[in-house]
């Protein structure tokens, strides 16, 4: 059999992701010598906090380098449960599994429930991996278009969501705060979504990885519902909040029976999360002072990016309330320049050395008139990058 005769599952994945544009940027920097301003990266630009690094080093020096339980170490599971219980409804250690990154947590959740032909409702736009994994498992992504208004941002469009729930619907995916839009959804909307999910007897997979990145308003977590065990699969992790993207640690919270089944799957896929990384994560909970400082810094950066984007003619932008992304509408510019959003992003890299992520990466249709910019970069780079972006757009608009 030819080595390139891949499975249906493998062939169902497109491979289009934010990383493609990072590769283009690296090539441009190498060949043209342009200093890249990277608004495409989806991670904090700060190093992992010192006490976390030191805890991991200490565990290495003490020889904590073997396998752990597939569930993760008990101390970390307990600390996660205590932390969430202090904010929301009660969570027990037995209702937590630690995973190698939040993406793995999402994969376990989909793998546990999705059979071929099952439908999964995903808001459009959304993080691209949701739909890719659903397709890989033979499921069918069903998209609900979010509504955009420059003054109020994006809303969930729950009436359309209700109309798309049928006997094949297995799950609804929620991401709050939201990538790529930077929205923190109205708590009333989230409450209504939770009610719909329970009423229709479908699962709610809630990805709350950006839960500390909130600049205005209040976020409502699905774990605030006393009945969360009946329908919620909750995903979070350490990558964003503690600037630990390369450490690859996430976790799932769900009913104990669900966690047990996930652990069985985990033991046969990756055995366990990295031992010494878990010791580092345990130290993360000792203080949130650095987190608060980072959020304050990112809020200032957000304000700068918003004000600079507002100066560009033809752009509509809502000031994001959460995560670390701005998602401006550039549909008028694309139309006048006769460009797709993908071509816009590629040309912006090639000609000005500025990396953005075209909204079409976040399927399916809504994003085709938007680009995503991360403000997890230095203030001077934000100003310089938006200046270059304005020059590029002015050039496109010149007859």
Curated annotation (Swiss-Prot):
Its cofactor is pyridoxal 5'-phosphate. The keyword Phosphoprotein does not apply. It is found in: Cytoplasm. Gene3D superfamilies: Aspartate Aminotransferase, domain 1, Type I PLP-dependent aspartate aminotransferase-like (Major domain). It is an enzyme of class 2 (transferase). InterPro entries: Aminotransferase_I/II_large, AspAT/PAT-like, NHTrfase_class1_PyrdxlP-BS, PyrdxlP-dep_Trfase, PyrdxlP-dep_Trfase_major, PyrdxlP-dep_Trfase_small. Its main location: cytoplasm. Pfam families: Aminotran_1_2. The modification N6-(pyridoxal phosphate)lysine is found at residue 240. One of its GO terms (biological process) is biosynthetic process. L-aspartate binds at residues 42, 179, 372. The keyword tRNA processing does not apply. Keywords: Aminotransferase, Cytoplasm, Pyridoxal phosphate, Transferase. GO terms for molecular function: L-aspartate:2-oxoglutarate aminotransferase activity; pyridoxal phosphate binding. Its EC number is 2.6.1.1. It comes from the Archaea. It catalyses: L-aspartate + 2-oxoglutarate = oxaloacetate + L-glutamate. One of its GO terms (cellular component) is cytoplasm. PANTHER family: ASPARTATE AMINOTRANSFERASE. Homodimer. Belongs to the class-I pyridoxal-phosphate-dependent aminotransferase family. This is Aspartate aminotransferase. It comes from Sulfurisphaera tokodaii (strain DSM 16993 / JCM 10545 / NBRC 100140 / 7) (Sulfolobus tokodaii). The lineage of its organism: Archaea, Thermoproteota, Thermoprotei, Sulfolobales, Sulfolobaceae. The gene is aspC.
